[in-house]
Amino acid sequence: MEKLEADIVIVGTGASGLFAALHVPSDKKVIMLTKSDAENSDSFLAQGGICVLRDKNDFDSFMEDTMKAGHYENRKESVEIMINSSRDIINELIGYGVDFATKDGKLDYTREGAHSKPRILFHEDITGKEITSTLLDVVRKLENVTIMEYVTMTDIIEKDNVCYGVLAKDANNNEMSIEAGYTIFACGGIGGLYNHSTNYPHLTGDAIAIAIQHGIKLENVDYVQIHPTTLYTKEKGRAFLISESVRGEGAKLYGKDGKRFANEVLPRDIMTQKIREQMKKDDMPYVWMDMTVLGEEVI
């Protein structure tokens, strides 16, 4: 078995893993693992945008929108941190080179589901790709960070309830151990387990399963976020995502009777429920979306 050592091992090369790598002291050796190409993370697939506190007067509204969307089961202090740090993080992303849309020389904002007002920054309809590819380019230039592609974590190295790194295997099933003082899981969810998903198929919840096996505390694992709208297909595998900002900018949903059946900017779980109810009512595997209001150029 090949043995490697690092100060920190980060499992996952999406936005969170890359952002973590960028905040590690430069004298610390970092190894990042990904099951596929570094570009094949769900962070690359996000279309609509990223929310940010527009100004101090927006805090209460932003807080209420977020808590309501989470059925008030959110960890309040985490929501506060997310909101209060959002502007600094956006400025940091811009500093790395992320190009958000502007209007009249100022940042432009759109609206997405569950938000009562526009507070979403975006880059065309490929915001995730813009953010994550920019971060990846910066990380790849760091001398203290090594990215290992097509390497799958199989377990953690644990003794006396302490984590000392991870066990992994490469594309040829060659086993390796990576000993590290700190281990960061940033490896996504379980979308790849579903027949129909907007996620990459290799996202199979490995870290969640390993955490359960080792008694690592998890929270709200029964909550799976479902994106309400994809382009209908009978084929299995990754579906084409229709961005939430499409509805935020005015696209409407209709049943087979040609009538609207819901507010299109409801929180994702409720929007998904409304669509499923309409599909059952219509005895159809899909509903209709009219986005002509956006205009041919935008579409």
Protein language model regions, located:
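N-terminal Rossmann-like FAD-binding beta1-loop-alpha1 element of flavoenzymes
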Residues: 8-32
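Glycine-rich active-site loop/strand segments that organize a redox cofactor
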Residues: 51-82
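Residue-level detector of alpha-helix initiation sites
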Residues: 14-15, 37, 126, 190-191
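Glycine-rich FAD pyrophosphate-binding loop
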Residues: 25-50
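Glycine-/small-residue-rich beta->alpha transition segments that form the dinucleotide
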Residues: 180-182, 186-191
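Core beta-strand elements of the Rossmann-like FAD/NAD(P) dinucleotide-binding domain
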Residues: 3-6, 173-182
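Conserved redox-cofactor binding core of oxidoreductases
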Residues: 95-174, 186, 230-233, 253
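An anion/pyrophosphate-binding glycine-rich loop and adjacent beta-alpha core
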Residues: 38, 210, 216-299
